[in-house]
Amino acid sequence: RASILVFLLGCFCKIQMLPFVGVLFLLDYLRGKRVFQKETVYSKIPFVFIAFIFTCVALQFRKDQTAFVGDYNPFLLVPSQIAWYGMKAFFPLNLSIVYDWPTVLFSKAFVALNVGFIALGFLIFRNRRNPLFLFGSLFYLANIILHTTLFTRFLGPYADRYGYLSILGIWIAAFSLVGQKRVKTLHIVGGLVVAVFFLVARQQTTHWKDTISLWSKNLEHQTSSFSNGMRGQLYFEKGMYAAAQRDFEIIEQDPDPRFEPEKYGYLYSALGLMTTESDGVKSAEYFDRAT
């Protein structure tokens, strides 16, 4: 009953709790249990029911939203995402609201990441008798695939917030490989990990003065124009038109595929308004592009 309550509370917090149900079934299968045994299925019915309700709610909220508009299937990014968030778990540096992602898919790095993804599958299979390793690995994988690929929207699929819950799976899997005789080592390393993430979180909060500050910080180590567009919108809403125009003109010159069509409509309408008095011809062109 306690696990059901915790699962329910987790679903209210984040859709990323939903893969927990699939992980439960996969654990039974990989550990050699009969997945569709009556007792096994009955024990999971409450989780399945709760997950179904929250899935319907999530789909209802997303049905009117524009999906990822890249010229490739977002599933091709899965190996890159798995490696990216894994790297951020162990090296939480240059954290951002949203990150650049590969624009050239079939590169050497893309091939290497796919090979690494296959190797990860072998590693999971090899440790299938380790329940904590299985749970952590599968929870991490299911979260990333569900939340950043299957339901990619708006700022997906590379953003810090998608890793908040997911990387717990990585640490559970990693710590499960430490022998039971090394409990002291586990406590020391675990304490250091918690301390590091506490310090990183504290450092990040220094940039949280307002949303404009967050996007400005993002521009210090991200090269795409997406952040300019998001910051420009905030400038425009605050009436800081000169700053907004500079950001919007940057994204006009270097368009970003993460922007949905309606965002470009907003951008060109704003540029049209801001250039009405200074350049009527250009303003008319902007309004025309907005439509």
Model region roles, listed by residue range:
Residues 1-243, 249-250, 255, 259-265, ...:
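Polytopic membrane enzymes that build or remodel cell-surface glycoconjugates and lipids
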